[in-house]
Design a protein with these regions (language model features):
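Active-site beta-loop-alpha junctions of metal-dependent nucleic acid enzymes
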Residues: 1-25, 45-46
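Short, conserved loop/turn and helix-capping segments at secondary-structure boundaries
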Residues: 2, 42-50, 78
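Extended, hydrophobic alpha-helical segments in both membrane/secreted and soluble proteins
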Residues: 8-12, 27-30, 52, 56, ...
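Alpha-helical scaffold elements adjacent to nucleotide-binding pockets in ATP/GTP-utilizing enzyme cores
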Residues: 11, 51, 55, 76-84, ...
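RNase H-like two-metal-ion nuclease catalytic core shared by retroviral integrases
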Residues: 28-29, 42-43, 59-86, 103-108
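Short, solvent-exposed loop/turn segments at secondary-structure junctions
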Residues: 34-38
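Acidic, His- and aromatic-enriched active-site or binding-groove loops in soluble protein domains
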Residues: 45-61, 85-95
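Active-site-proximal acidic segments at structured loop/helix or strand boundaries
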Residues: 81-149
Length: 149
C-alpha cells in the first residue's frame, strides 16, 4: 500500500511471527526504506536506512542487497510475484467476482494461507528441486528465536 519504513517493519514483524523465527539474512531490493547509498563506504559496504539497521540489530538479522541489474537475485523475487499473481490472485478474483465478493486484504489473507498450504508449498519448486514444505522443515532449524516483544 505504501513505501514507508514503518510499514516495512510491520510487515517484517508479521512475517517473523508467521514463520516462528528470524532468518540470519534478509535479501532486499535497492529501495530507499532499506538502503540510502550502495557501496557508500567501499564495495559491498552500503549505508542502510538507520531504522532498518537498528531493527536488524534488535531482531538479529543482517540485511543483504540484490545486485542491481542481476537477474539471479532480483529476478527470483519478480518471478515469485508473477507466480503468486497468476496462480493465486487472478484465479481468486475470477472465482469471487461473480459472487460479488471483493478481494480485500482480509479476504486475500484468508484464502492465501489455504493456497500456500494446499498449492504453493506442495509443488516441486524448479530452483530448489524440492517442495517448499519439505525445504522449510530443514531451514526452520537455522532460524533465530524471536526476541521478546
Amino acid at each position: 500500500d505504501n513505501m514507508r519504513y514503518d510499514t516495512l517493519e510491520t510487515c517484517h514483524r508479521n512475517a517473523f511471527r508467521f514463520f516462528g523465527g528470524v532468518p540470519r539474512e534478509v535479501l532486499y531490493d535497492n529501495m530507499k526504506t532499506v538502503v540510502l547509498q550502495r557501496d557508500a563506504y567501499q564495495t559491498g559496504q552500503h549505508r542502510f536506512h538507520p531504522s532498518l539497521w537498528q531493527f536488524g540489530k534488535e531482531m538479529g538479522f543482517s540485511p543483504r542487497l540484490c545486485r542491481p541489474f542481476r537477474a539471479q537475485t532480483k529476478g527470483k523475487v519478480e518471478r515469485m510475484v508473477q507466480y503468486t499473481r497468476n496462480s493465486f490472485y487472478i484465479p481468486l478474483m475470477t472465482r469471487l467476482r461473480p459472487m460479488g465478493i471483493t478481494v480485500d486484504v482480509e479476504t486475500a489473507n484468508r484464502h492465501g494461507l489455504r493456497w500456500l498450504h494446499d498449492v504453493a508449498n506442495q509443488r516441486k519448486h524448479e530452483t530448489i528441486q524440492a517442495r517448499p514444505c519439505d525445504r522449510w522443515l530443514e531451514e526452520q532449524q537455522s532460524m533465530l528465536a524471536l526476541p521478546p516483544e
